[in-house]
Amino acid sequence: MKKSDFHYDLPEELIAQAPLAERAASRLLVVPPSPQALADRRARDLPELLQPGDLLIFNDTRVIPARLFGQKASGGRVEILIERLLGERQARVQIGASKSPKAGSLIALDAGGQAEVLGRDGAFYLLRFEIPTPLEHWLLEAGRLPLPPYIRREPGVEDRERYQTVFAREVGAVAAPTAGLHFDEALLARLRERGVEFGHVTLHVGAGTFQPVRVDKLDQHVMHKEWLNVGAALVEQVRRTRARGGRVIAVGTTVVRSLESAWRTTDAAPEGELQPFAGETQIFILPGYRIRSVDAMVTNFHLPESTLMMMVSAFAGRERIFEAYHHAIAQRYRFFSYGDAMLLWSRAWGLGSGDS
């Protein structure tokens, strides 16, 4: 299987450059298994599309203002994108500079203080920050929000709120779990009234999410690592949902990545079952992989040839995904992080007559 198998042409004007005024006003393309028809809805319609007893699982990671700028001793400019916080004064980072900085060199930070280059960590660098407060708190004032590269503007004050889910609480991501951006407090309240239950995982979206696949043969691709936590309480919620015949719906590919990373086969469960797990994942989901943990997912529209296009193709079938994307382009849906979403059902799932 090749990267080019997941290419599609997208008019640039369909790449959303800013969020809508209302989160839940985003369009929602409902994609049931073929041959059922696609349906154009809104995110605010989700209570009508789900059933009492269903379980929505969100990623509760919180985006940090992870972009910094500075200057080397030589005078060369440096851009720093924090990949992961490592305690109060250290971080794993990407560095953009005309020449790679050497271990032991210092970077004077535009926001004040300096950072020492401790060395390389694979494609990343390890930095020690000489700053007055712990890095997590210092970044709130000194850092800039790392909007994705396809958003061709500088981040504004409103992005501090809108590039963050309303349920974000665990600090550590450098990119938002964007499917969650469509949920506001009013929509969450209506879903609760409908009898839909909520669960949470944590996956800290890393800077690797912005990196393109650089090889055409996908068996040569090295997936980036991300830290996640699937807790025992969530595992029990999923077990209860399954026992009562409810459906498990992931809000975003990061939730699917988390749940599939925590899926384990045992003698008692040869087909596998969800188990608590905290740690790094490097899972690469593409067609041929069977996603067992969820029945449906809410997900945004993804970049051509991206690993997320491959994941949703594994879930719903490549032909069905391309049918949905061609429909979305023809209907002028908004794409990527600040864009619209899909409610995507597994191709293994048959919708009952009570579903819309």
Swiss-Prot record:
The keyword Amino-acid biosynthesis does not apply. One of its GO terms (molecular function) is S-adenosylmethionine:tRNA ribosyltransferase-isomerase activity. Its main location: cytoplasm. Pfam families: Queuosine_synth (PF02547). It catalyses: 7-aminomethyl-7-carbaguanosine(34) in tRNA + S-adenosyl-L-methionine = epoxyqueuosine(34) in tRNA + adenine + L-methionine + 2 H(+). Its EC number is 2.4.99.17. GO terms for biological process: queuosine biosynthetic process; tRNA wobble guanine modification. GO terms for cellular component: cytoplasm. The keyword Heme does not apply. SUPFAM superfamilies: QueA-like. Pathway: tRNA modification; tRNA-queuosine biosynthesis. It is found in: Cytoplasm. Keywords: Cytoplasm, Queuosine biosynthesis, S-adenosyl-L-methionine, Transferase. NCBIfam families: PRK00147.1, queA. PANTHER family: S-ADENOSYLMETHIONINE:TRNA RIBOSYLTRANSFERASE-ISOMERASE. Belongs to the QueA family. Monomer. Transfers and isomerizes the ribose moiety from AdoMet to the 7-aminomethyl group of 7-deazaguanine (preQ1-tRNA) to give epoxyqueuosine (oQ-tRNA). HAMAP family: QueA. This is S-adenosylmethionine:tRNA ribosyltransferase-isomerase. It comes from Xanthomonas oryzae pv. oryzae (strain KACC10331 / KXO85).
